[in-house]
From Swiss-Prot:
Subcellular location: Cytoplasm
HAMAP family per the UniProt record, alphabetical: HTH_type_CodY
Family, as annotated: Belongs to the CodY family.
Chief location of this protein within or outside the cell: cytoplasm
GO cellular component terms listed in the entry, alphabetical order: cytoplasm
Superkingdom of origin organism: Bacteria
One Pfam family matching this protein: HTH_CodY
Protein name as catalogued: Global transcriptional regulator CodY
GO MF annotation terms: DNA binding; DNA-binding transcription factor activity; GTP binding
Modification Phosphoserine occurs at: S215
DNA-binding region: 203-222
């Protein structure tokens, strides 16, 4: 397969995504096919975002690593020393993707390390490995193109996470600001009583202890529930089951108490 055809195959994957998140596993499968190598997309913390195997490596440690989808911490950290594409590294290299305990079996093993960079930040590493055949310029062009695509996708996911976090926080702040002083006081006592993200409480007991009416507690819970911050369910004589749905809620509540 010529370089142009291989590039088109990678482009076809991106075009088929059509604005949806690119699946790192599918991306790895396509890279594996066009570069004809084992492919590992490794995050900053060593998590395997995606991988595909071209040549099976019979080694228990490698099998466990793939099953756990996690590269060893020491190896992951060492990858940060590679700041530009390093190709055709032998099995004696610190960066080899082949099991060092079986060097004699993988004497022809070659590894290529491609940093994944986006927004001026190291986002991860693309690790390629194969036996015998050297990685040529065409392979490296495809690898660097792929690492750019992966970097853009990681940045997009990070931006979405930040946006979602900001949205969750805004919802919580609006919900809390909608509470009256007595309702806020009631909520603070309720979650002191729960001491966690879910549990049972008896509203009348809290009302008596704090010196507020039961209706204040009910109204406060309704406001938070309508905002999607909590879920509550009456269990009759047992009390009310409450579960926090927005993980920013308890953080914001704690901030209010310290201010």
């Amino acid at each position: 397969m010529e370089l142009l055809a291989k590039t088109r195959k990678l482009n076809a994957l991106l075009q088929s995504a059509a604005g949806k998140p690119v699946n790192f596993r599918e991306m790895s499968d396509t890279m594996c096919e066009v570069i004809e190598a084992n492919v590992f997309v490794v995050s900053r913390r060593g998590k395997l975002l995606g991988y595909a195997i071209h040549q099976q490596i019979e080694n228990e440690r490698m099998k466990h690593m793939l099953a756990e989808r996690q590269f060893p911490e020491e190896y992951t950290q060492s990858l940060f020393n590679v700041t530009e594409t390093s190709s055709n590294l032998g099995v004696d290299s610190d960066y080899t993707a082949f099991p060092v305990e079986n060097r004699e079996l993988f004497g022809q093993g070659l590894t290529t390390i491609v940093p994944i960079v986006g927004g001026g930040e190291r986002l991860g590493t693309l690790v390629l490995a194969r036996l015998g055949q050297e990685f040529l310029d065409d392979d490296l062009i495809l690898a660097e193109y792929s690492s750019t695509v992966v970097g853009m996708e990681i940045l997009r996911e990070k931006a979405e996470e930040i946006e979602e976090e900001a949205r969750s926080k805004a919802v919580v702040q609006m919900a809390i600001s909608s509470l009256s002083y007595s309702e806020l006081e009631a909520i603070e006592h309720i979650f002191e009583e729960l001491n966690g993200t879910e549990g049972l409480l008896v509203a009348s007991k809290i009302a008596d202890r704090v010196g507020i009416t039961r209706s204040v507690i009910v109204n406060a819970l309704r406001k938070l529930e309508s905002a999607g911050v909590i879920e509550s369910r009456s269990l009759g004589m047992k009390g009310t089951y409450i579960k926090v749905l927005n993980d920013k809620f308890l953080q914001e509540l704690a901030k209010l108490k310290t201010n």
